[in-house]
Amino acid sequence: MARFLQFDAVSFAYPGMAAPLLSDVTAFFPEGGWTGIVGANGAGKTTLLKLAAGALAPTNGTIRQLGTACYAVQRTDAPPVGWDDFMNCWDAAALDERRRLGVGEDWAERWDTLSHGERKRAQIALALWRAPDVLALDEPTNHLDATGKAVLLDALQHYHGAGLIVSHDRDFLDALCTQCLFLFPPRATMRPGGVTEGREQDRREQTHARERHDANAGKARRLAAAAQQRREAAEQSAARTKRLKERKPPAHDHDGRFLRGVAKLQGKDGWGFTQSAELRKRAAKLAAPDASIRVDYTLGVAFAEAGVAQRAYVLDVPPGALDLGDGRTLVHPALQIRPNDRIALVGANGLGKSTLLRHLLPQVLVPEERLLNIPQEISEDESRRIHEELKRLDDVPLGRVMTLVSRLGSRPARLLASTTPSPGEIRKILLARGVARGPHLIVMDEPTNHLDLPSIECPEAALAEAPC
C-alpha cells in the first residue's frame, strides 16, 4: 500500500492568536521523496511538521496519512524517546543505522558528554530505525560538520517513506528534496525541485505580479481620469437641463416637443453619471491590492554603534588542558585575542570546540554589556527568560531591538505576541540585543543554527564590516 501524507485546507492557530499561523494549506507529500519546508523564523515550519506527525491537530481542515509518523525535534538537550531501546537493539536495522550515521556503541551511557553534532546524528539514526511511514525532521543539519552532513544526506536518501525536512542549509535541501513547500504566513505554496529552483520560480512570479499590478495601476489612473471627465460633463449638462426645465414651454408648443426634449436631456445626464460610476468601479478593481504580491521588508543589520576595546588584548590566557570526558583531554596553548582579531575555531564534531569557548568566556577582558555571545544551543527555560526580558524593556530600547529583529527577517508584532518563540527567533533577539549595545567582542558558536535562509546572509554582511 502506498504511503503518503495529504493536507486538505488545513488551518492552525495557537490559543490566543489573533490570526491563524497557517491558513487553508493544501499539499501532497508522496512516498519516496523529501519535501523541504521553507520559510522565515516563526512562519510555522515546526508547527507544520508537528501537524504532519500528529503531534498537533489542525484548527480546521483535514490531514490524511497511511501508517505511522515520527517527528525528530530541533533540540538535542535530552536523549530522544526510545534511546535506550535503540542502543540495546542488535538487529540488522539498528546496527545498520548506527553504522551509517557513525553512532558509537559507547554513546548509550554518555549522552551528556556527546557534542551536539554527535547527538544530532544519534537522534536521526533512531528516527530512521523506527522506519515510520512519515518522517518529519526539524533542522537535522544543525551542529553537523561537512562530513556529518554528507553522512546524513546518504542516510536520508535511503529512506523510502514520505519525508518532510526543515533546514537552513540551502545546498542540503537542493541535494535531497524533490519539492519544497514555501510558507508565507498564512499562505503556503508548493514548488517542484530544491529550494534554489523554487526561490527562482517565486522571484519570477513576484516580478510578473508586480509588473501586472503596475500596468493595472496605470489603467486604473486613466479610467479614473475618464470617470472624472464623464462626471464633470454630466454635471454641466445637468445644470443646463435644470435651467431649461425651469423655463416655461413656448406658447406654440402644443404637442409637448419642448418637454420631451428636456426629458431626453435628463436621460442623457443620468446615463453620463452611470458611465462615470461604472468607470470608477472598474478603476477601483484594477487598483485593488494584489494578494499574491508580498511586502518586501528591508533586511540587513550593521554594527554602527560597535566600538573597539581600548586595550591590547580582550583575552589573554595561559596554556591549559580541558577534560572532555571519556578519557579525552583538549590541550591548548597560550591564547591571546586583540581587539580587531577575527578568529575561526574549526574542527570535527566532538573535538571540544564548544567546551573551549565555555572555558574562555569567563576570562574575557571586556565588560559584560560589551560582550555579544550567542551559544550553540539555548535551552527552553533560557529561551523563555530571554523572551520575557525582551518584553520588559522600555519603549525606546525595545523599539531599537525590534527594528533590528525586523531587519533580520522576523515580524516584531508576531514575535512579541508569541508564547513560544522558535529557536531561530531567540537567536535573532540575542543578536539584536548585542548589536544595539555596541559590542567590543563577538563570540558565536554555530551562528547559523536555527536561522532561516535570508537571516543567515544578514549577520555575514554585518560581521564583515564590524569594527570590533
Question: Language-model features: where?
Answer:
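ABC ATP-binding cassette signature C-motif
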Residues: 1-209, 303-468
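Extended, highly charged alpha-helical segments
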Residues: 60, 84-97, 182-297
